[in-house]
Amino acid sequence: MFIIAGPVGAGKTTFYEAYLKEPFPTLVPALRHQQQPFLDERRSFAVEDIRVDTQLLDQAKAAGYSTKVLFISTEDANLNVGRVFVRMSRGGQAVPVSSVIDSYRESTKSLSEVPKLADELLVYDNTAHRRGFRIVAHFIGGKLSKTAQTIPDWAAKVFGKELHAVKQHEKLGRGR
């Protein structure tokens, strides 16, 4: 099971369309009653939401699923607002500015818990929209296994302690 999370306008659907649609053709809405049949029938699926639903992670793990979370964000909520306006101008769903900004604030609220709950967490920055998704951190089995050279502020606020520890370890390793 994949959960693709992040604020409105961060690029979740774009990521899904480019990388996950073929192996996970069903993108289930973030509505519990629509996810339950997949869990009951033990079918693979992907969920897109603003925040990572930690209860869904627990439920999926209890049902024997391998759980992978992809979190995508940008450095600034105003960038997301601009992207949503572009999407709306092309016939996409209208989203109020306040909802985009609120989603930016809400999206990281439970994110620091996810490495302990999911089998794998990949954290992406999509600030440089045309340059693609940049991996910021990769957690496997609750442990940070990989980080980018530069960490965006939004990710440092969520995973600061873990990222700092890895950077210190890397510095010590180079000094030998």
Q: What spans do the regions from the language model cover?
A:
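Conserved GTP-binding G-domain of TRAFAC-class P-loop NTPases and closely related GTPase folds
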Residues: 86-175
